[in-house]
Amino acid sequence: MAVKHKVVSLPRLNRLSPTLESTALKLMEEAGELAQAIGKLRGLSGEVCYEDTRAVMEKVTRELLDVAQTAVSMMFVLEEDYGINIEAALEEHIRKLRAKGYLSL
């Protein structure tokens, strides 16, 4: 079976001056908003969800893309401010997934 890929190409935000710390905090904030959207659908907050599933899934999608954008912003910070090679790190990440048995190529 061929391995599927989901390619997400998001821009470097050019009207912000992110730092490692500010981006990490923003990532946690966005992840919290994603969890909140999922929790609302599942009734985990104790309140009844009156929105239809499609509307909630669209909100979950928007929040997930906010998480992805912030993660990409952090990648730019790591590359530009700390000299990290994200491509090499990605290759190592794939090797790790294979070693753990999460992925076979």
Language model: regions and residue ranges:
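Flexible "arm" and connector segments at domain edges
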Residues: 1-105
